[in-house]
Amino acid sequence: DHRYLHSFPTRRSSDLRVGGQPREGFQAVRHKTPMVSLDNAFSFEELADFDRRVREISGREKVEYIAEHKFDGLSMSLLYEKGRLVRAVTRGDGSTGEDVTPNVKTIRSIPLAVETALLKKAGIPESFEVRGEAIMTRKAFEELNEQQEVQGGKRFANPRNAAAGAVR
């Protein structure tokens, strides 16, 4: 959940910079740990099976989770090293995704850097990964489609496609 990162502001914080134009051309990047997904789970056993697979893949005995309501967006991995955003990768097929770092750096709600002293104080290593969904709110989606119509552009079918288009 990247919202936690906003408690570690820097002079390069996202609310202090202007958005930029996304760039074209993406390089394939293999995820250090696969980005597995959870299909609908209707029982504790299905959820426990997911946990077992995550622990096997990660090589960890214990894994902490953060659960939120389901968002329909583009799954992303953000890698920070020494407190700086160094790579943003789409989920892709789960093993390999697309490096969309330049485009993600134009999204104002994504911190480009977090203060390492504050990370240390919170027990967070200087190098860490954040995984989540790039989403577009219904209101932003409707406003975007209105702009598309006025400019003679093509309307997006749904917020997920619009979010993916903004990142890619």
Located regions from the model:
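Short, exposed "boundary/linker" segments that immediately precede the start
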Residues: D1-H6
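RNA/tRNA-interacting regions in translation and RNA-turnover enzymes
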Residues: S7-R168
